[in-house]
Amino acid sequence: MLPAVGSVDEEEDPAEEDCPELVPIETTQSEEEEKSGLGAKIPVTIITGYLGAGKTTLLNYILTEQHSKRVAVILNESGEGSALEKSLAVSQGGELYEEWLELRNGCLCCSVKDNGLRAIENLMQKKGKFDDILLETTGLADPGAVASMFWVDAELGSDIYLDGIITIVDSKYGLKHLTEEKPDGLINEATRQVALADIILINKTDLVPEEDVKKLRTTLRSINGLGQILETQRSRVDLSNVLDLHAFDSLSGISLQKKLQHVPGTQPHLDQSIVTITFDVPGNAKEEHLNMFIQNLLWEKNVRNKDNHCMEVIRLKGLVSIKDKSQQVIVQGVHELCDLEETPVSWKDDTERTNRLVLIGRNLDKDILKQLFIATVTETEKQWTTHFKEDQVCT
């Protein structure tokens, strides 16, 4: 693992990492039967951010404050970990396993040293004792890979859904992390975390001048033009801003429609050239052709920009009009996975059907992507490459 960047004051405040008061869980069948909504799906929110940004501080706040929320928190930090982690990681026969503990405010907590999937599977046995799940990633983790496991794990599919991705950024060291150069042209972890976020928390704003916060906010917006940016101190935030986001399901259709109308395209402020682009194309798309468009971008990664660089899409979101469907369809793409889902919103007879997409990624060319989408909407599967010069198709 790479060491944390910066001096000692970048680390979490030890006082913030004190282990909260714990009581053993004693779950009985009658207690669980008393809980309502046992058949409902449980939302999972991914908490990510660079080392020392304030993830553990946020989770400790949620675990100790009185907020009437029953939240299950999975701490998933590698290495030495915090005081809270050390108290929860239990060793038996030389192997670490997770132990769920219940806190005085009704929250549940455990610590794991893997991707957290097994912990969530075990957590489902306690269904009825919590309403939300927060999953912390390691500081160097790609949240896209973590998010994708909730789309592909069939056993969990009927019990949980991905609610959103929260990225915490250190206001003092954020720019340094975002501009860190990686070998072989790779996107650094901090930038990818910001690009994938639905909510971006600029933390520790009380430690830097206001001008530095503004500069960081501008840089974050240049990377991710879709996510909401909030400023915090000591990771304290209204839970309504991090829970029940519905960022990945059809319930977000109405709010997404309004949001997409105001998403600006961005210009790169960093060497990585991560930008947000958006475009509108009127008409209907055939679902199989739309899937082909997404496959070329997310899986094959075989389209080049005008500078002959392969485009890399990190996050894709939009509302599209599918031929022969009366409902608007939300399209989501993260980490080579994509999903189409009908929303409750119907197309009005007197309104022109249109497709509006927002893509976040590197080396993106709006004109080429829009041209590719138009070809996908109006022409057959084998004709799309004829709209590009041979050197514009990655091989």
Swiss-Prot record:
Give the UniProt subcellular location, in the record's own words: Nucleus
Q: Which SUPFAM superfamilies match?
A: Hypothetical protein YjiA, C-terminal domain, P-loop containing nucleoside triphosphate hydrolases
Q: Which Pfam families match?
A: cobW, CobW_C
In alphabetical order, the GO MF annotations are: GTP binding; hydrolase activity; metal ion binding
Q: Which InterPro entries match?
A: CobW-likC_sf, CobW-like_C, CobW/HypB/UreG_nucleotide-bd, P-loop_NTPase, Zinc-reg_GTPase_activator
Short motif CXCC motif, span: 107-110
Protein purpose? Zinc chaperone that directly transfers zinc cofactor to target metalloproteins, thereby activating them. Catalyzes zinc insertion into the active site of methionine aminopeptidase METAP1, which function to cleave the initiator methionine from polypeptides during or after protein translation. Mechanistically, the N-terminal psi-PxLVp motif binds to the C6H2-type zinc finger of inactive form of METAP1.
Q: What is this protein called in UniProt?
A: Zinc-regulated GTPase metalloprotein activator 1F
- Annotated source species: Homo sapiens (Human)
